[in-house]
């Protein structure tokens, strides 16, 4: 059945109740409304550490891990995307998977969300997680995540975990607040069987934007406006490839961007072979930026 619950987060203050249904395979489902899961406690400002845990494409070009960006503020730790290789990448870089409080997903392709079945399984059996995890993504998240879990580990989505799994499906240009992270989704030009997004994430007074996978679209200018850091996918050097961005397109539009810092990521083999000749800062696995 359905129940109104008042989630308690680490702030301990009053929180906005939201409608949720228990009874589904994934514990608690929340529908995004502005102000969702918002804490009233004052929060510290910065520093915010952005770590490119995985900066690679879907094919592991040059041995890079698939997309996974970790964000650490003074009192929180969460991921943006969690590609299939992310659990290995986190452990290799000395990060405890059970520390992850939230995962924000740009889109539902395996190199961006395929690590979730492993992260959730780890929480149940290896890390012995007890704290809730909130997963935020596009419409279709609940169905696709359940399918992925069942294909990889049959029965895993039906086991009642020792921790709450909270799913939040978000819509474009409708900012929501989860704990004290404000996230806004912008439409991306990328087919993934569900809406694909660029994500603007504001936490501890800093703004980080990740393009997700997308062809060049001027929406990227809107999404990244005045951001402290904009991580932009740069799959190819100068070809026009459907669904993906290129270094040439980014450079054509660089002067129109108002972000304070730009880093390119999600590069294919050809792009990586030319990374020494580009005029932009490039991500690599383990690269850390302090905002």
Describe every region a protein language model picked out.
Residues 11, 64, 91, 222-223, ...:
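Residue-level detector of alpha-helical segments with a strong bias toward transmembrane helices
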Residues 12, 22-29:
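Intrinsically disordered, glycine-rich low-complexity segments
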Residues 3-5, 17, 30, 36-209, ...:
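Binuclear metal-dependent hydrolase catalytic cores
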Residues 7, 27, 40, 212, ...:
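Residue-level detector of intrinsically disordered/flexible regions characterized by low predicted structural confidence
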Residues 215-291:
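Cap/insert and terminal regions of metallo-dependent hydrolase folds
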Residues 10-11, 16:
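Short hydrophobic alpha-helical segments enriched in small aliphatic residues
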């Amino acid at each position: 059945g359905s129940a109104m619950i008042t989630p308690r987060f680490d702030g301990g203050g009053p929180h906005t109740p939201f409608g949720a249904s228990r009874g589904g395979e994934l514990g608690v489902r929340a529908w995004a409304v502005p102000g969702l899961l918002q804490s009233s406690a004052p929060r510290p400002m910065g520093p915010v550490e952005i770590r490119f845990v995985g900066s690679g494409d879907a094919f592991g070009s040059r041995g890079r891990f698939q997309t996974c960006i970790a964000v650490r503020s003074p009192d929180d730790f969460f991921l943006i995307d969690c590609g299939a290789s992310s659990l290995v990448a986190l452990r290799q870089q000395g990060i405890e998977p059970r520390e992850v409080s939230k995962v924000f997903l740009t889109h539902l392709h395996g190199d961006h969300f395929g690590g979730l079945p492993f992260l959730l399984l780890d929480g149940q059996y290896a890390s012995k997680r007890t704290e809730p995890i909130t997963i935020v993504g596009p419409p279709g998240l609940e169905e696709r995540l359940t399918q992925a879990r069942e294909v990889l580990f049959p029965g895993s989505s039906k086991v009642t975990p020792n921790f709450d799994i909270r799913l939040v499906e978000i819509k474009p240009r409708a900012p929501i607040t989860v704990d004290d992270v404000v996230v806004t989704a912008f439409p991306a030009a990328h087919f993934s069987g569900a809406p694909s997004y660029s994500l603007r994430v504001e936490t501890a007074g800093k703004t980080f934007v990740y393009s997700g996978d997308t062809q060049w679209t001027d929406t990227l200018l809107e999404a990244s406006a005045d951001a402290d850091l904009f991580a932009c996918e740069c799959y190819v050097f100068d070809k026009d490839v459907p669904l993906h961005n290129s270094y040439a397109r980014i450079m054509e539009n660089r002067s129109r961007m108002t972000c304070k810092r730009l880093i390119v990521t999600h590069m294919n083999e050809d792009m990586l072979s030319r990374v020494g000749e580009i005029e932009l800062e490039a991500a690599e696995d383990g690269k850390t930026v302090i905002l």
